[in-house]
């Protein structure tokens, strides 16, 4: 607008021919924030000789780096960089023409201060328990409104009177604690400008150290190279620094002291007497310090100085010495490790061979007439009220060689190699040699004689080639304690002598069990088996039967009934077969009737019972058949009989009654006659759950659910069909009406359907004829008054056969539950379902 006015005035001057001087400034009033920059343009219309700027103090402005002047023809630009409060005021732009006439224009510059946070420190730290003042210096023009927020909530709204905003806008927290730690927001607002700014200040609460010393008293043993670790842990915030002091002096790590875990562990090494006393642990951080002391008590623990292994000879004398020191002087005890027997000063063993003698810190264990059982480990224990020390030694007893095995007699024969073992124990170990007479074995030209060592044994392997190899052999064992020898004899083995005491212990028509006693001599070689020869008296040929191993009992089978046999027994070893025993004669039993059969039974499937026949005495002739008679016990019915082939091992009784008791007699028959009957009684179980035991037995859950759904659908279909025929309603009737448009009831047969009198039979099926009647339609039987079926168009001309059941009162009735109706060749036949077999 001012620019247009200038051009307008310029036009007037040109038009009037006069050059009047006019000055304008682009802005008349400006608000500027401290630190911002701004420029102003002054335009002089006319013929200005100069254009100058004057500051609010009236001083002519000279261009500087911060306040800069730029002239462009009739324009002069004043630029103020980084304005401050002192720059506020009225600035004048003055133009001067050649005649010295001046014109000026002014601009008002207002400087305001934005929200300014000065020297805001974060984090700010305080000591727990003190009254804290969180400093936040904020200024602006006009003065700001300051608020504090903690966890996005103004502290003035927190229900804790420990928080308050002071007049200097600082936040006061009384009795500050660790839970007050966090980030606090100092927020300033200038309502006039809608200006807002904030600073987040981290508040840290320092907690003075608190020392935790799990153990304050320690015991240690001096001058034994031991070490002791003192533990000092401290809590606090920030983590405290731990230092150890001894006699007021700071402990530093060296050969004596080891510091670990940020000085939480002090290890005192190579403890000596002067290391005893107090050790002070001091913990320090910004919030303060804490200290506690631990006490190290140094003792001289028992220590065994002298204990060494000893060696002695069998039947000799030895003294075991144990010396120990300590403060107080320890007591010394001995323990024999092999049996745990303890020996103290003055003790003696029951046999008087072992005795303990002792004096100040020294104990001696005396053993006389040393036995091999005295060898082994001995423990010496030195103990006092402050501890103990234990060491072990070994008593080694040397002795001359001893032969372990008592077997000195061996048997073999020519061509049969044998090993003779010389088992020797000795301390120190012995050297073992085999000799025959004075010849050291093995010798030249004795390839059939070999020796080899296996552990402490020296094996002599002999493969006899002649009688000269049988005889005496000598095993000699030698160590520095002595020499021992033992003689071994190799005898020529023989076949066993004859068994004796042969007798028959069991006899039947076809088998015989014999027993006998072992022979008095096995010939020097173990018996392999026994051979039993058997033949008929009139026969020349012996049949050979071998025993199972060395059993002295043999069963002869496949014999002929009522026949006389001869038997003899011989023992067989590696050398061969021995002499036979004397011949024994026996006669098998004649063929006779079989013995009563042995049986046991169990319920079978359905209404049947299974009787199993165990193997029995058939009397010497095969069983031809079993005659089975059975009847119910409850009603004492007539006996029912069935026959089973003799080669069967079980009998099945069928068509029995549930929960009924039965009596059974079973007789076995062979070609000579019948056995005595075996009587057996049993009771049938109750009737099972048909659905559970038949339909669902072994089916999975899915199959059972499927069957249930199928059954439900079947019930719905049957119900709908019944409604169709009886009530002329239901889904099927609805479909029929829709398809046919009228009821299917015009025939005489439909009329009978409505009256419920017609019977229906499925084409080609074997399902029973089902007759429908109303309740009042009954025809009485002329004989017993029972209802009978009224003839109709579907009734067969022949009456069905009825099998009556007899009740206890003798009256014959027709039980509906026992009738099974079948259709065959257009004739209905009825029969009883539960027929007694």
UniProtKB/Swiss-Prot annotation:
SMART domains for this protein: FN3, IG, IGc2, IGv
Tissue: Expressed in subsets of both olfactory and vomeronasal neurons in a zone-specific manner.
Statement: the UniProt record of this protein carries the keyword Transmembrane: yes
Cytoplasmic side: 719-837
Compositionally biased residues, Basic and acidic residues: 764-785, 799-810
Sequence positions bearing Phosphothreonine: 780
Cellular component per GO, a single term: synaptic membrane
Comp. bias intervals (Low complexity): 789-798
Glycosylation, residue list: 177, 219, 309, 406, 419, 445, 474, 562
GO biological process, one term: axonal fasciculation
Location of region: Disordered: 764-810
Disulfide links within the chain: 42-93, 136-186, 232-281, 322-380, 422-475
A molecular function GO annotation: identical protein binding
Range of residues in the leader sequence: 1-19
CDD domains, alphabetized: FN3 (cd00063), Ig (cd00096), IgI_1_MuSK (cd20970), IgI_1_NCAM-2 (cd05866)
Residues in Fibronectin type-III domain copies: 495-591, 593-688
Claim: Lipid biosynthesis is one of the keywords in the record: no
PANTHER family: CTX-RELATED TYPE I TRANSMEMBRANE PROTEIN, NEURAL CELL ADHESION MOLECULE 2
Protein name (record): Neural cell adhesion molecule 2
Organism this protein belongs to: Mus musculus
């Amino acid at each position: 607008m001012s620019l247009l006015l200038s051009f307008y005035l310029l036009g007037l001057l040109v038009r009037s021919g006069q050059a009047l001087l006019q000055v304008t400034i682009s802005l008349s009033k400006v608000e500027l924030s401290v630190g911002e920059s701004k420029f102003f343009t002054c335009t002089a219309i006319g013929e200005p000789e100069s254009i100058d700027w004057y500051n609010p103090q009236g001083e002519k402005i000279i261009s500087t780096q911060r306040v800069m002047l730029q002239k462009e023809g009739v324009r002069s630009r004043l630029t103020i960089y980084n304005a401050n409060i002192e720059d506020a005021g009225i600035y004048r732009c003055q133009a001067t023409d050649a005649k010295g006439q001046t014109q000026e224009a002014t601009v008002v510059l207002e400087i305001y201060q934005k929200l300014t946070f000065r020297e805001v420190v974060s984090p700010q730290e305080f000591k727990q328990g003190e009254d804290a003042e969180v400093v936040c210096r904020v200024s602006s023009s006009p003065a700001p409104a300051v608020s504090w927020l903690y966890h996005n909530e103004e502290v003035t709204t927190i229900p804790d009177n420990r928080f308050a905003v002071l007049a200097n806008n600082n936040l006061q927290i009384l009795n500050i604690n660790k839970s007050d730690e966090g980030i606090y927001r100092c927020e300033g607002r200038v309502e006039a400008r809608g200006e807002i700014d904030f600073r987040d200040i981290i508040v840290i609460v320092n907690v003075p150290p608190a020392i935790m010393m799990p153990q304050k008293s320690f015991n240690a043993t001096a001058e034994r190279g031991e070490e002791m670790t003192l533990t000092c842990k401290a809590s606090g915030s920030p983590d405290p620094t731990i230092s150890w002091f001894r006699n007021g002096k700071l402990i530093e790590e060296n050969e004596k002291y080891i510091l670990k875990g940020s000085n939480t562990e002090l290890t005192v090494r190579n403890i000596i007497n002067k290391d005893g006393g107090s050790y002070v642990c001091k913990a320090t951080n910004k919030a303060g310090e804490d200290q506690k002391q631990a006490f190290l008590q140094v003792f001289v623990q028992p220590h065994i100085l002298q204990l060494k292994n000893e060696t002695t000879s069998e039947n000799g004398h030895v003294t075991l010495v144990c010396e120990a020191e300590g403060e107080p002087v320890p007591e010394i005890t001995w323990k024999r490790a092999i049996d745990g027997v303890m020996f103290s000063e003055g003790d003696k063993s029951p046999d008087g061979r072992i005795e303990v003698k002792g004096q100040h810190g020294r104990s001696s264990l005396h053993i006389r007439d040393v036995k091999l059982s005295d060898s082994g480990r001995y423990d010496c224990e030195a103990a006092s009220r402050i501890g103990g020390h234990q060491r072990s030694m070994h008593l080694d007893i040397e002795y001359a060689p001893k032969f372990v095995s008592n077997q000195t007699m061996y048997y073999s024969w020519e061509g049969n190699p044998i090993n003779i073992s010389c088992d020797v124990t000795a301390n120190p170990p012995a050297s073992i040699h085999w000799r025959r007479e004075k010849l050291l074995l093995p010798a030249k030209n004795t390839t059939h004689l070999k020796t080899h060592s296996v552990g402490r044994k020296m094996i002599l392997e002999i493969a006899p080639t002649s009688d000269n190899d049988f005889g005496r052999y000598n095993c000699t064992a030698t160590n520095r304690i002595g020499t021992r020898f033992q003689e071994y004899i190799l005898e020529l083995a023989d076949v066993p002598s004859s068994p004796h005491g042969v007798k028959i212990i069991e006899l039947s028509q076809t088998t015989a069990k014999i027993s006998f006693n072992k022979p008095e001599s096995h010939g020097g070689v173990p018996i392999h088996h026994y051979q039993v020869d058997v033949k008929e008296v009139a026969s020349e040929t012996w049949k050979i039967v071998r025993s199972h191993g060395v059993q002295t009992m043999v069963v002869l089978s496949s014999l002929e009934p009522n026949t006389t046999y001869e038997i003899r027994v011989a023992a067989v070893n590696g050398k061969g077969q021995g002499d036979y025993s004397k011949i024994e004669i026996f006669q098998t039993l004649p063929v006779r009737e079989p013995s009563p059969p042995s049986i046991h039974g169990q319920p079978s499937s359905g209404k049947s019972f299974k009787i199993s026949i165990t193997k029995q005495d058939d009397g010497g002739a095969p069983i031809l058949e079993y005659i089975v008679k059975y009847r119910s016990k409850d009603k004492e019915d007539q006996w029912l009989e069935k026959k089973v082939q003799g080669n069967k091992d079980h009998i099945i009784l069928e068509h029995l009654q549930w929960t009924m008791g039965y009596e059974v007699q079973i007789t076995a028959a062979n070609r000579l006659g019948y056995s005595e009957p075996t009587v057996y009684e049993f009771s049938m179980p109750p009737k099972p759950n048909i659905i559970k035991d038949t339909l669902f037995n072994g089916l999975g859950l899915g199959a059972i659910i499927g069957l249930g759904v199928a059954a439900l659908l079947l019930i719905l279909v049957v119900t709908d069909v019944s409604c169709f025929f009886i009530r002329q309603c239901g889904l099927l009737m609805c479909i029929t009406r829709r398809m046919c448009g009228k009821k299917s009831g015009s025939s005489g047969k439909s009329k009978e359907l409505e009256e419920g009198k017609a019977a229906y039979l499925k084409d080609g099926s074997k399902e029973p004829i089902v007759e429908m009647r109303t309740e009042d339609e009954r025809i009485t039987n002329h004989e017993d008054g029972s209802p009978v079926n009224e003839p109709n168009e579907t009734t067969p001309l022949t009456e069905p056969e009825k099998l009556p059941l007899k009740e206890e009162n003798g009256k014959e009735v027709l039980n509906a539950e026992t009738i099974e109706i079948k259709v065959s060749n257009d004739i209905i036949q009825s029969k009883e379902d539960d027929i007694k077999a």
